[in-house]
Amino acid sequence: FVLPFAAIACGFVYFSTPSTPLFRDGSIMKAVSGTLKQLRKTISMVDEFPGLGRFLVGRIFYTDSANTATAFAAIYVSEEFGMTTADIAKYMLIGILSSIVSGFLWGYLVDIVGPKITLNLVLWIWFATFSLLISTVWLGLPAWLIWGAPFLAGIALGGTWCADRPYMLVLTPPRYIGQFYGLYSMVGRFATIIGPLSWAIIVDELGLGRPAA
């Protein structure tokens, strides 16, 4: 895996090099300073709007869990249940198809009951999914039960995509939509980083195993 990642890094350097002369002396630092100043201002405004801060903090955790589950699903079922490459392909296909189909249903549900109730229901489905993945290993349950996990995870992913952004839109005042959606996006990127990092620490450094991660 080292070579592909190294190639991607070199690609970033190569394609960004032509734009480097466009920056005058000090302009980069000025841009970074301005961005950090605006970020601090945006964060300080979060408490002015009820529920927004709690939602963004919560989003770190459920986005972290969802990203990590999808990123390491193939490794988990391969190492813990000995699935073959063909089995893993079928396993992932179940998740993809269930997320596509359920997405339409979640969209209708958001329109009917609102994004908050829908998102809470989605989080319970995520809880059921992770409980199934963990208990199948720790409690020695029949291995065939694991095939229900991609179905549930796909449904939960579809619901997350359908309810997450609309709920943010409900919590955000119209005049600050662009500003707070930048913070919303940053929270998602942060979760994308800490998810795999947490997995590596729990599995490799602490040796607690994949179910614990």
Predicted regions: what they are:
Residues 101-115, 203:
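Helix-to-loop junctions at the C-terminal end of transmembrane segments
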Residues 112-125:
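Cytoplasmic membrane-interface "Motif A"-like loop-to-helix N-cap segments
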Residues 85-86, 174-184:
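Loop-to-transmembrane helix entry/capping segments in MFS-fold secondary transporters
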Residues 124-141:
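C-terminal ends and interior cores of transmembrane alpha-helices
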Residues 71-88:
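Short amphipathic helix-loop junctions that connect adjacent transmembrane helices
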Residues 159-173:
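Intracellular juxtamembrane helix-capping segments at the cytosolic ends
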Residues 19-57:
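Juxtamembrane intracellular "pre-TM" segments in multi-pass secondary transporters
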Residues 1-4, 201-213:
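A membrane-interface helix-boundary motif in multi-pass transporters
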